[in-house]
Amino acid sequence: HRPRVEILWDAGADLILFETCPSLEEAKVEAGIAEGMGIPYWISFSCQDGGHTCEGTPIEECMKEFEQREKYPNLQMVGVNCTHPQYITELIRRMKSITSLPVAVYPNSGEIYDPVTKTWHGDFVSGRYEQWALEWMEAGASAVGGCCRTVAKHIEEVSHAREKFLNR
């Protein structure tokens, strides 16, 4: 990862986002690169359910590691991406119970990927992503967006959720 980070940083990046981390070990390696370079960064995990990274580590364990601010002083935010939206609220709650860092979430569209047929299944339900996004903001997410299979309509719904959240 280091050569890519150096290229991005030298090109003028404001921070480096290490995303879709399937494991705590990979995230620690990536954090070590950024800390070694003395640059600001985010770490975002991909999760298999409402409590575990894709390789199975409890998300609380990941947060405990990165809550060591003396070890990770350049870490600006932690997050979850490339994960089904139904798991995000619980993940935010678990993360916020441990970390003082801001939490970012940008899940997939809600469709399900079939690795055998290499196809996505499910339909976009108007308004559902907005409901989820509002839930995520209420649970404490500081940044909300979209990952795989999200389109402009999803982000429009995030914007509507933000308006509702700010006008409460």
Where are these predicted regions, by residue range?
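Domain-level signal for soluble alpha/beta catalytic cores
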Residues: 1-168
